[in-house]
Amino acid sequence: EAEEAARLQAEAEEAARQQAEAEEAARLQAEAEEAARLQAEAEEAARLQAEAE
């Protein structure tokens, strides 16, 4: 019984670790999308600047 409880505890900890990794991956994905958006805005600003000159 104690061994089963310990095994279930270890499985729960592994599941929590995987959940945390998935949340970190989602956060990094969102940061990458924001960086891409800012890059596109910078390129658009540079294009408008070139047109204005």
From Swiss-Prot:
Q: Does this UniProt record's set of keywords contain rRNA-binding?
A: no
Gene Ontology cellular component list? membrane
- Keyword set for this entry? Membrane, Repeat
Q: Region 6 X 10 AA tandem repeats: what ranges?
A: 1-53
Subcellular location field: Membrane
Q: Where is this region: Disordered?
A: 1-53
Q: Where are the sequence repeats?
A: 1-10, 11-20, 21-30, 31-40, 41-50, 51-53
Q: Does the keyword Disulfide bond apply?
A: no
- Reading the lineage from the top rank, the first entry is Eukaryota
What name does this protein carry? Answer: Membrane antigen containing repeating peptides
Q: Lineage of the native species?
A: Eukaryota, Discoba, Euglenozoa, Kinetoplastea, Metakinetoplastina
